[in-house]
């Protein structure tokens, strides 16, 4: 490998590792660091590195990868081997084949998002790994603060199925209130729970000082009478609460005699209406259902670790075995909102146009951006069971998704902010036949026609390349010399057909269209949604939900197609 090929190798590797843009200093460091015999020639090598890096940065990622495969295929083989070395999920404690039962318990008060997906995917993957059962349990017993909505029950099921889940059982907590009542009454009869009618502020003061509520040790008969009054509507909201007896000296005041069931006046629950007034809180309903449904393993966020402490009191009172609990940290993604309350507020204020707004981190939003379900699952499995909080960058998810969609995404030219280029010196019609996918010739070709006297359109993004006297190659068409640049457009002259001439002279390559279809690409950038308008190949055979690559622009998902225009959403480079 000569010096130029060596520089080209390092420049391509650096570019592919950094979104298609190589850093000259990094390349120089690699060339001289790993080839010390070249250091005496540094003054000659540095300009050559700058020249080759400029050439590499003018390629799209596809061209960079093709070139690197040509001169250094070992890079891709090493990457493949490294990936194969990656371990999957670690063994699950106390797990037996065929006996593992896991559950995912979302609240249907908003759309399923990437943060929720961690517990869901881990639960499902382990259930499948051990030939067990995966249960979806809707935790919908808070009709006041976290009010469930009918559409979210459906959406969560749809999203899980889209992610590839096989749901073995579905249970809805609001359908099981009589079961919770039965266990609450048993605990009262056992003297392990009581009905507290202290004002909330008074109980909080007693609890914080480790002092028993005056109702705590009253006879079971009195407790049962109060319990029946709760059920019969003789107490109003806030006047009575069922509490589980715990350790009044527990270091965490929130564990001391925690609330199990409370009254909600006029709940107007979407499933049960106003039939029930006494509603279990999460820890009570969850503890009962995990036992009733035979759950063996729970995957729970580290921030909810104290739930186990509370729930174990119920398990100990009934003599039940508590499920194995695996705690993991929170998962967030840089610059993407996952909070359901913030999302809802943004939708209500008109900031977002729905739960699938591509700026959001909901599963529906990721799907709308062209993120594949396999990519989301792989990302979660890669993060694994870390107890620490994890913040991933969009680039992490994009890198996985790119590897998945690259083989399936057909290629098209999209010219953003089009500028006309008038070409002289070529007087024949020229039809460029371009593969829909460079690695899959069986998919056929797309045809772009050049007609003498009619302009081609190039992107304003490439304006810095169009200087009088410079040369560029119109990708898959021919090479031209730039003659003049003005507000009206670009004048150019045909130079040659052969790609080899452009390669030998290191001329930059640009994409183009003739008569294109109007196309807008929505690009999420943090909390902003940028719209890039331009032209798509007029004969591009795209339909809604297709994920395609706009060459030199990025991967997009087709969101809308009409005879007049195409709308796409940008996924990533």
From Swiss-Prot:
Superkingdom to which the source organism belongs: Archaea
Catalytic activity: tRNA(Glu) + L-glutamate + ATP = L-glutamyl-tRNA(Glu) + AMP + diphosphate
InterPro entries assigned: Gln/Glu-tRNA_Ligase, Glu-tRNA-synth_arc/euk, Glu/Gln-tRNA-synth, Glu/Gln-tRNA-synth_Ib_cat-dom, Glu/Gln-tRNA-synth_Ib_codon-bd, Rbsml_bL25/Gln-tRNA_synth_N, Ribosomal_bL25/Gln-tRNA_synth, Rossmann-like_a/b/a_fold
Family annotation (Pfam families): tRNA-synt_1c, tRNA-synt_1c_C, tRNA-synt_1c_C2
GO BP terms, alphabetized: amide biosynthetic process; glutamyl-tRNA aminoacylation
One cellular-component annotation, GO: cytosol
Annotated signal sequence range: none
UniProt xrefs under Gene3D superfamilies: 2.40.240.100, HUPs (3.40.50.620), Ribosomal Protein L25, Chain P (2.40.240.10)
Keywords linked to the UniProt accession: Aminoacyl-tRNA synthetase, ATP-binding, Cytoplasm, Ligase, Nucleotide-binding, Protein biosynthesis
Classification via SUPFAM superfamilies: Nucleotidylyl transferase (SSF52374), Ribosomal protein L25-like (SSF50715)
EC number per UniProt: 6.1.1.17
Residue ranges of the motif 'HIGH' region: 106-116
Record's subcellular location: Cytoplasm
Gene Ontology MF term list: ATP binding; glutamate-tRNA ligase activity
Record's function text: Catalyzes the attachment of glutamate to tRNA(Glu) in a two-step reaction: glutamate is first activated by ATP to form Glu-AMP and then transferred to the acceptor end of tRNA(Glu).
The family this protein is said to belong to: Belongs to the class-I aminoacyl-tRNA synthetase family. Glutamate--tRNA ligase type 2 subfamily.
Protein name as annotated: Glutamate--tRNA ligase
Lineage per the UniProt record: Archaea, Methanobacteriati, Methanobacteriota, Thermococci, Thermococcales
């Amino acid at each position: 490998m000569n010096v130029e090929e060596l520089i080209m190798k390092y420049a391509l590797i650096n570019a592919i590792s950094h979104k298609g843009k190589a850093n000259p200093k990094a390349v120089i460091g690699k060339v001289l660091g790993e080839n010390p015999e070249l250091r005496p020639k540094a003054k000659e090598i540095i300009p050559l590195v700058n020249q080759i890096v400029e050439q590499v940065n003018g390629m799209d990622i596809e061209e960079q990868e093709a070139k690197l495969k040509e001169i250094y295929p070992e890079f891709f083989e090493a990457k493949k081997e490294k990936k194969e070395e990656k371990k999957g999920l670690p063994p699950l404690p106390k797990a037996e084949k065929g006996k593992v039962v896991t559950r995912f318990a979302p609240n249907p008060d908003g759309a399923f998002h990437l943060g929720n997906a961690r517990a869901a995917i881990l639960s499902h993957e382990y259930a499948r790994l051990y030939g067990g059962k995966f249960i979806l349990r809707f935790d919908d017993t808070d009709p006041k603060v976290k009010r469930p909505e009918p559409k979210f029950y459906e959406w969560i099921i749809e999203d899980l199925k889209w992610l590839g889940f096989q749901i073995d059982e579905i249970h809805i907590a609001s359908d099981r209130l009589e079961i919770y009542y039965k266990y609450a009454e048993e605990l009262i009869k056992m003297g392990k729970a009581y009905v507290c009618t202290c004002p909330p502020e008074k109980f909080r003061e007693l609890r914080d000082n480790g002092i028993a509520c005056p109702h705590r040790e009253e006879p079971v008969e009195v407790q049962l009478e109060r319990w029946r009054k709760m059920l019969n509507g003789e107490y109003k909201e806030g006047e009575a609460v069922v509490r589980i007896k715990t350790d009044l000296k527990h270091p965490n005041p929130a564990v001391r005699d925690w609330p199990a069931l409370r009254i909600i006046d006029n709940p107007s629950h979407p499933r049960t209406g106003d039939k029930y007034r006494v509603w279990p809180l999460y820890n009570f309903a969850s503890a009962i259902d995990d036992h009733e449904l035979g759950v063996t393993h729970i995957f729970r966020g580290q921030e909810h670790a104290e739930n186990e402490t509370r729930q174990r009191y119920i398990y100990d009172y009934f003599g039940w075995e508590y499920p194995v609990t695996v705690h993991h940290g929170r998962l967030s993604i840089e610059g993407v909102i996952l909070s359901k309350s913030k999302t809802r507020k943004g939708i209500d204020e008109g900031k977002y146009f729905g739960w699938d707004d591509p700026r959001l981190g909901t599963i529906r939003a990721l799907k709308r951006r062209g993120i594949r379900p396999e990519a989301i699952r792989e990302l979660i499995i890669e993060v694994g069971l870390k107890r620490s909080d994890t913040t991933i960058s969009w680039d992490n998810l994009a890198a996985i998704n790119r590897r998945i969609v690259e083989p399936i995404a057909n290629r098209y030219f999209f010219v953003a902010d089009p500028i006309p280029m008038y070409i002289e010196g070529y007087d024949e019609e020229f039809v460029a036949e371009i593969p829909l996918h460079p690695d899959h010739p069986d998919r056929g070709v797309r045809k772009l026609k050049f007609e003498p006297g009619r302009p081609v359109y190039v992107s304003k993004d490439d304006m810095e390349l169009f200087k009088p006297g410079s040369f560029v190659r119109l990708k898959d068409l021919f090479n031209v010399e730039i003659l003049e640049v003005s507000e009206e457009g670009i004048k150019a002259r045909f130079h040659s057909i052969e790609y080899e001439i452009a390669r030998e002279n290191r001329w930059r390559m640009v994409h183009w269209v003739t008569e294109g279809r109007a196309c807008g690409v929505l690009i999420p950038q943090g909390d902003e949604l940028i719209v890039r308008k331009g032209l798509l190949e007029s004969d591009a055979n795209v339909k809604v939900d297709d994920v395609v690559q706009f060459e030199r622009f990025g991967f997009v998902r087709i969101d809308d197609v009409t005879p007049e225009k195409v709308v796409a959403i940008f996924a990533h480079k």
